[in-house]
């Protein structure tokens, strides 16, 4: 069973006398006992037919509110419901019987035993073996801000100094603009519930992707990889060498592509996709050693072909990362 309309009415009676003062910052609450319903409040079988004794006086509001919260959190369904919501947000929006039994149930017990401490239950979920299971990787589409911020972190895009307020504002403006273009205008949700992608069944996260937003998501990464955002003499742009040099053997095409895709993508690629990426480094099927020689010259300032090799290799790396981030797998987290 579930709570009833009568339960809602009784809860409203518990809250009589309370008001909000919007003139304070932050808002404050006030209890006026003369406006409080002092009669008993009777709840349904869902709450064990609990009766909250009516109180009077200046402490009546706190006393009855505490009694109601104790009653509400004494019902197992409260912890189960909240854990399902956490699971939908952080793991996946479909909860089958197996997940309900093996994950949600035990998680709800942890939640109750912790005194309903969100930090404890989140730590348990996010450190669980289930959370890192391969089946749960790449199953949620990134929201636009996660895609943007994730890209900047992955590519270690350098931002202006924290004291340069004008440039920083222009950088945030870029993010805000692309957020609006991809249907996440921060600070201006469509309604009080927020954005449907985080709550609306059955679409949930799939709402982020459509024929209009997908090209614009790709345009964001393309722009910062290939062109950069110029404000005066400052350019915000991803340097492909920063990430590339962190790999174990970037001079070997197969190693570079394998480690780059493992780092940037949640799912493994097909042989055909890997071949397509390799074609960027070795156009026309030329031997692997061509990239190895090019990479060596590009990273050795004393090499007589350094400048030419650096320009060519940089262009190839930019196109490689562009291609990886244009894959559908990059839209997943």
Regions found by a protein language model. Give the residues of each.
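Flexible, low-complexity segments enriched for small/polar residues
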Residues: 75, 79, 83-114, 123-333
